[in-house]
């Protein structure tokens, strides 16, 4: 809501509902069974934080990639799932969708970035603009590479460096 979203619907496992309602009482909530219906309702889909890395999470992510062409923001475990061996095929589908015009925004911290690019964390820290650009090019979208400084990279090679902030900005929930 602080970013201007008019209405937010959280699709999550039922056991997460109570704690989430305490933190975000104004949001709507639905179960994983309502994912397809909710994707039709949404203007933008964000996936990743709190999704986990189990098989159920991968199936949920597959549904988001395969059943929708809405703009997609991916963070946290959604990125980790793409980097894992059983997520490679899904990553390829997402790259194809990006090439076909789907809006894709990936928001990795350097650990997630290193896994997605199969590089070391020190390499990604040292070459954050280049790694951000590589990720943006790979998925034909936008990469928001988070570290002590955040770099927003576009597929075309343009990037914006946010010189404010600190390493805490790459911390979960910031």
Which sequence ranges carry the predicted segments?
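Small-residue (G/A/S/T)-rich helix-start motifs and N-terminal tracts that mark the onset
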Residues: 1-76, 80-105, 110-174
